[in-house]
């Protein structure tokens, strides 16, 4: 899992939660350049914030990760309304703040979705149009 988040404490908390759940976090990217470097490791899943150290680059990062690397991308942001119709190739958005249980249910859904297993999206996840087609 790749975490694209510029708030260091939030990113560390996410990494700890995911590690405790048995997920391998390949890195934390606070900006587009770092995300592009870490993308070379082909993450299966990425959690991406919208507004990063280098500005509102999250949507572009998410689209690149999905389209160029085949990553399942979920936006995790306090500004979910900015993603009205979503970002092509990405799955959806969860509003911050989010608790450990919600992260767990969302990650479970993402893993199942990625491997083609049937799963219902958790209530905290707003799917983008055409996500499940």
Residue ranges and their predicted role:
Residues 96:
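A Lys-centered signature of the CheY-like receiver
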Residues 5, 77:
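Conserved acidic carboxylate
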Residues 99-104:
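Conserved two-component signaling phosphotransfer/partner-docking surface
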Residues 67-74:
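His-Asp phosphorelay/catalytic-motif detector in bacterial-type signaling
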């Amino acid at each position: 899992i790749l975490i694209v988040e510029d708030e260091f404490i939030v990113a560390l908390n996410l990494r700890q939660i995911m590690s405790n759940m048995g997920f391998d976090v390949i890195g934390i990217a606070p900006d587009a350049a770092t995300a592009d470097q870490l993308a070379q490791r082909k993450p299966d899943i990425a959690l991406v914030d919208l507004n990063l150290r280098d500005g509102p680059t999250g949507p572009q990062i998410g689209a690149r990760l999905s389209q160029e690397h085949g990553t399942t991308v979920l936006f995790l942001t306090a500004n979910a309304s900015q993603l009205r119709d979503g970002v092509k190739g990405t799955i959806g958005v969860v509003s911050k703040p989010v608790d450990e249980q919600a992260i767990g249910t969302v990650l479970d859904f993402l893993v199942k979705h990625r491997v083609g297993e049937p799963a219902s999206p958790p209530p905290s996840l707003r799917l983008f149009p055409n996500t499940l087609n």
